Amino acid sequence: GRGLTQCRSEGPGEIHFITHSLGGILLRYYLSENTISELGRVVMLGPPNQGSEIVDGLLTLPGFGFIGGPAGVALGTGEGSIINSLGPVEFDLGIIAGSTNINPLEFLFITGPSDSIVSIESTKVRGMNAHMVLPVTHTFMMRNNEVIEQAIHYLKTGSFILESIDEEVDD
């Protein structure tokens, strides 16, 4: 509401978004229910676009449903997950995933390389225009100079700076 109103008051033009983690899911949910006619490009940093494998692991612990509540349970990777009910994106989206793990217990919950919180695979979503992997952690990726440079470049051009794209993405 207020943020969009303020953007619109700045004058005509596109409204771009950079989100981090669950912020990307909130934007996807908002756009599934609303239209932003001035929507430009979106860059998501470490979004759990296919749900959270950590939530799946925590669901097995007694009391998680009570502590995490229905919202916590709905963030998993299962069929009942709100995240997985959102479907493909229909806007210009670039995603940056991290590949640096500093979580010694990650192996208990996450399959494959991750940023310590979200697996690289889980960041992907059907309809995305670009995906890249950088050697950053989930918690601090938004403060990383290369992430910032890549995000700004994507908002301006609709593509990431190709020299930095991880080879995993080219498969």
Where do the language-model regions lie?
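Serine-dependent carboxylesterase/thioesterase catalytic core
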Residues: 1-90, 107-110
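C-terminal catalytic-base region of ester-bond hydrolases, centering on the histidine
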Residues: 88-171
